[in-house]
Amino acid sequence: MTRVLILSWEYPPLIEGGLARHVRKLSEALVERDVEVHVLTRGGEESPAEERRGGVVIHRIREPKRPTDLGEFVAWVERMNSDMLAAGVELGDRYSFDLVHGHDWLVANACDHLAKRFDAPLVTTIHATEHGRHQGWVDKHPQTYIHGVERWITNRSDRVIACSHYMREQIADIFGVDEGRVSVIPNGIDPDDLQPQDEEELTRLRSEFAAPEEKLVLLIGRLVYEKGFQLALEAMPRLIEEVPGTRFLIAGSGTHEAELHKQAEELGLMEHGTFLGWIGDDVLHSLYKIADLTVVPSIYEPFGLVALEAMASGCPCIVADTGGLREVVPHEEVGLRFPARDPEALAEVAIRVLSDDELGRNLVAEAYEHLRRFDWGDVAEQTAEVYAGLVGEASRA
């Protein structure tokens, strides 16, 4: 049985974004495939230093005090890595790890040192790049530092995992990594998380945001520039004019939140929608079921999990024609795409779906088979194959 140490800066119940959910689902699915999984992460005082959950052994360091100044974030990450390294060394004395698997730049330093100490292969999953998040502008701190760490760790790793072919090309081009060392393994979804819920409760929830005869447009994600919510707001006046009674619902939080509120006020949209802020998974999954349309207007998108979850929940979706969204949403098959950064095109496609209920139903129906590609079992199987190949190579060396 392969024993792997996975490092992630977040893991439930500590959730910053999608990474925590991804690592948990992957870890638990790997356990079902006879991989012994240990996760090294951070946690608050309320979380146990060590526990077994879903078959995964979770080890937590106490979280260093979080800085309020973004400029101090890099130093905070370095302290976290130092603490993780110390904890990882102790774990290495207790267990014999066959492989180290790190997620993103935030744990790169600790991963590299631990892999060398254990004389074990190193796998790194790159979920997004700083270069992509900032459209290539990485000449200022902390972007320069983060970009440098990403380049360094991808070239140090024995194998890099990317969530889409788009990301594999980006990693190869930006960091100079041989594409042969980059495995494409998509993110997964768990249909059980998206099962139908009490209809009365869903009706009550929808009534908080829209009347029965109105159309509800949903946007979910971190409120940051690269997610493109500002483009969706720019498209809303025309959408409301063409499809009277259209309302929007934005769920998420982030550094761009105040600007989006200001933009909505300037466009006269505040009476036509709601900013929900950060929400938990239970509410998140319900929102897909009460919406008439999910919009993913990203400027930069390595994968596109929101689109997958929307389709799996029976909600039609339209997405920007960019990045991994091209692979997740085949155009005119399971969803519709519009040119990225084009609010007019976004409005036109949204109007088309909201004005044609049959089109929406057909898109959702066609998505059923497509979604089978993203089952967590398959994702874990592909990951376990990467592990087995590297461990086998190491044993023969």
Pin down the residues of each PLM region.
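A short, well-ordered alpha-helix in the C-terminal region of glycosyltransferases
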Residues: 345, 352, 359-373, 384-385
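Conserved acidic donor-binding segment of nucleotide-sugar-dependent glycosyltransferases
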Residues: 331-332, 336-343, 352-357
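Short alpha-helical donor nucleotide-sugar binding micro-motif in glycosyltransferases
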Residues: 278-279, 286-291
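A short helix/loop element that forms part of the nucleotide-sugar donor recognition site in Leloir-type
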Residues: 141, 195-210
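N-terminal subdomain of nucleotide-sugar transferases
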Residues: 1-57, 395-396
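Aromatic "clamp/platform" in nucleotide-sugar-dependent glycosyltransferases that forms part
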Residues: 299
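Carbohydrate-associated surface elements
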Residues: 166, 188
